[in-house]
Amino acid sequence: KKKGVAQQRVKISIPLPEEQWTLFFDDVDLGPEDVVGEVDEGFSILFDSLNPERIILAALCCGIGRFALNKGVAYASERNVFGQPIGAHQGVQHPMAKAHTAVEMASLMTRRAAWEFDNKLPAGASSNMAKYAAAEAGIEAVDAALQAHGGSGFTEDTGLYEMYPLVRLLRTAPVNRELCLSFIGEKVMGLPRSY
């Protein structure tokens, strides 16, 4: 640990296995031996190193979405009102079908990003699209499953509501949707830099 480097734990309200920390650098002297990569290329190196994280988190969001939808479909198939399953009603069925479609599309982009990364191809575009799409799809899926369950979706027995804070966090961190969209706009679509 270098002189002038300090760390402080950040307490977050979502139970996660990993911890969050803030690092402070006050008058830290660095020598050539401390340089990682090439001088003045740090931002580019950082973005490339974040692609695997985006792919992993996209896969996690797809998994959360599938978990939630499996619960929602099971409940909507079993719960009968006025002699028929509530899943027979479009108001219950369509939001889950829409969320399922979004999760599967996000999963395909996640697989593409993973394939590109594994084959040492540029994966920035697909990683950002996967992260964006999967986080949005995960939230949509959890919300649709909660709505299908009604009030019982918020009970501990369903295990649904516990998914919402995590999938909502993943929409914002470690990279928020706006940065993903800015990357896509600039690097994929050729639009002027927005940040």
Identify what each model region corresponds to.
Residues 1-74, 84, 179-180, 186-187, ...:
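FAD-binding core of flavoproteins
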Residues 46, 72, 113, 130, ...:
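Short alpha-helical scaffolding segments that buttress acidic/His motifs in well-ordered protein cores
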Residues 73-87, 100-133, 146-154:
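C-terminal helix-coil-helix/basic helical segment that borders enzyme active sites and/or dimer interfaces
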Residues 137-145:
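Hydrophobic alpha-helical segments of membrane proteins
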Residues 149-195:
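Glycine-rich phosphate/cofactor-binding loops in nucleotide/flavin-utilizing enzymes
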